[in-house]
Amino acid sequence: MLVSLSWLKDLVQVDDSVDDLAERLSMAGFEVENIDDLSARSQGVVVGHVLTRDKHPNADKLSVCTVDIGAKESVQIVCGAANVRAGIHVPVATVGAVLPAVDLTIKAGELRGVASNGMICSLSELGLTAESSGIAILEDTTKEIPAVGTPVAALFGLDDAVLELAITANRPDGLSMVGIAREVAALTNAELSLPLLNHTPEQEPLQAELDGSYYAVACVEGVQGGQESPPWIQQRLNRAGINAVNAVVDITNLVMLEQGQPLHAFDAEALESLTGKPVDAASFAVRPAKDQETFIGLDDQSLCLDPRVQVVTCHDRAIAIAGVMGSRDSAVSDSTTKIWLESAMFSPIRVRQSSRAVGLRTDASSRFEKGLPPEVTLACSQRAIELLSDQFACRVNGRWVGGEGPRTPVPLQLRRDALHQLLGPIDTDSGPVDLADHTIEQCLTALGCELESTDEGWAVMTPPSRRQDLHREVDLIEEVARLVGFDKFGSHLPDPVSPGSLTSRQQAERRLRRLFCSTGLQEITTLSLVGSSDGDARIAISNPLLAETSHLRTNLWEEHLQICVRNLKASMAGCSIFEVGNTYSGTPESVVQSGIISGVICGDRRLERWSTSGKYQAPNYYEARGVLSRVMEALHLELSDRPLADDARLHPGRAATLVMEGRPLGCFGQLHPALADDLSLPESTYLFELDLERLLDATTRTNRWTPIYKSFPTVPASERDLAVVVDRNSNAADLIQAIRKAGKPLLEHVELIDRFEGDQLGDQKVSQAFRLRYRSQNETLTDDKIQPVHDKVRAALSKQFKAELRS
């Protein structure tokens, strides 16, 4: 928000310097980001009187002028403007003056052999306009010419400063000059002199579909669209960063800046020409845009709308994007004599959706998005009509309003004890003292609140402009603290202070990350947003910034493989990575978020190769699978592998479903050779995916970590190997489970140590060898005690799997 200090002083009688005022506003929550001192544009520029004008002897387009600047002697200035002549008053930049608008310092010198001691300025050289066709002639801009030698700052309104304020979302009143003036008055106890908002005449009901909006129109005849607005209006708009257009549009913009209520003027004749029908108040409506409905805005940009956008219509023809921008075809032009003046309160949510959908953010939309008080909607329309009446001999042919208007406000209860408890005492020379009642009342009254005393405190009726922000008791307490000064209150912390802590699931997730890192894998983070895919049911987001980030990802492994490709192309020996992240499935109306741990083991993971004579040694299936085994052993979780042949990503003979506690936890396997070849990845590339939620559930069960004492064995163990021939589709995990069950209570450990396939066994047979370790806690086992248990194991395998014993 750009705030002109001169305009602000017209609204509130404040005498503070611009620096003091900026500090007060910043301390009160309106951060001043920049101060533009306009007087710097005209320092050293004074009123001059051209006494003579002669042709330059050495240049056809230059003139030699004698100019009186109020000094003892007149000065000679060489000027190149075609409109310079004797007898006029002009702004003259004297020697030493600096003109920031054109980055020029005036020096005495010569032009084509003739001395020149100054420069006659144009409006653009003073930073007042973007372009100028000649020098500024004061007789054309003002009726009363100041004395020669007078600084021109006041003459051109440059005795001003513009403050750039950062307005937070909870203070929409700060987007108006009246709102800032009220704030300054509350901070400085200065007197307000706001423009009077007259009560509006009777409004006729507007019988139209308004899509939840509060909508008012007025028919005004007798305007002149081609007429410029007065200089004071143009100056105020210029200070606020808005270009002047014509008197009608400028007045609507002025009311928006002054009161915070955006207005819009439609050309009545243009509407009739556009729709081909007579236009009355009932012709207007508000509705969602139709799919693929076209719209050309005031910026001449053609837009294709959809139902997310709310539009204002005339005879069902879209003439404005509600709260954002009007249409080019209904805009006020030089031939406009009759307008329909719109003043409305559109839903902040709908305006925000419309603005995002079309990619437009305007001065109007920024105000509607933050919320407007409906109490001033009609009053601002009347304010604009009064300004139009001052400019033109116009008349109003009717006013109409429809939709849900202002509601009866409910006073807020402010308890004295609650305020003192939350803020505490203020620090004074005599010690800490609670705020006095009259100080509290003075602060709230300065904000425009109406107070009524109660037994516990006050019943507070907030002003309409602050009801978007002040709707709870604590909001009123904050305002009191802000106006008194936060630095005036003593610092105190709640007692006792509760330290923060991690939940058991958060601790478990952090431990998982550490364990994977300890195995040599590097943790990465990838974007949750990806591009579209024909073969993947990805969920599209509503307003993507880029086509590459337009959908929610359904997996992590695709991006992980691309990361491996990039790293190997960068001459990395290998790439072993993992990520803890979310994937998304379902429909746009019902999105399902799933947490997983996904990773890739690719290439050489070792940093040195001295043990392999400098040669690359690819990890085999069991080495890669051992990474997961080490993590699960640290978590005291047991995984078993089940054959997996229907995953298109993985090698059909080298993939497994990982089972924990009888339920699938995820998968592990070698990348399918065809996919590895397409991506130019090594054949020994392995993928894994684990269900994060199930892992966290398993590691955070309350009965899981109960300490159980188990003494170290003091007697030796006895190991025996057992090789069996079984069907090719027999799972080693099933055999191990059967061995453990049959080997109780002496069997301490069993592991697969060999797997053999050969022609001598047959196509459908395979040999699997296991190493069994027997031990007793109390005595050294002899063969007499081991052999019966070992025979029991062999018998169980023969019976359950039709196993042929090889040893």
From Swiss-Prot:
TM spans (from-to): none
Ranges of residues in domain FDX-ACB: 713-806
Subcellular localization, as worded in the UniProt entry: Cytoplasm
Domain of life: Bacteria
Domain B5 intervals: 407-491
Main location: cytoplasm
Full protein name: Phenylalanine--tRNA ligase beta subunit
Taxonomic path: Bacteria, Bacillati, Cyanobacteriota, Cyanophyceae, Synechococcales
